[in-house]
Curated annotation (Swiss-Prot):
It comes from Homo sapiens (Human). Residues 91-100 have a biased composition (Polar residues). This is Putative uncharacterized protein LINC02898. The gene is LINC02898. It holds the Pfam family DUF5583. InterPro entries: DUF5583. Residues 60-100 are annotated as: Disordered.
Amino acid sequence: MVRMSRPLFLDWAWRPLCSPSQSLPLTYGPEGWILQWKGTCRQQTALHCPFDFPQAPLRGRHTLSQVPNKGHEKASAVQLPEKQGTDQSRRGPTSAVTKARTSYPESETFIVYLCSYFWNSSKGVYMSGST
């Protein structure tokens, strides 16, 4: 079991990616904090935080469960299209974040999918501390 002394959620690297053009509606519900994000293609995604955000540090295993509309249940499968007609050899390796910014500069829905991809890749991380 991996133990971390600092809360993972508050220091997360994907937080700067999740900054849409307007402020995010963050409400507190019976299951914890709920982040409701309406994308550009009229699909609403709710991210449930089952802990008392923003209180930290955290104890135990906490996950953000994504509740998208039906038909969009595979948000972790993110594939970035290659830009054609661009010489990539002279600029060196390009990160997935840079590709996402150049391919989808204004797509908030894609940013939500990218955030959920990074979250799903770290589901096995445990956090410890005292609440």
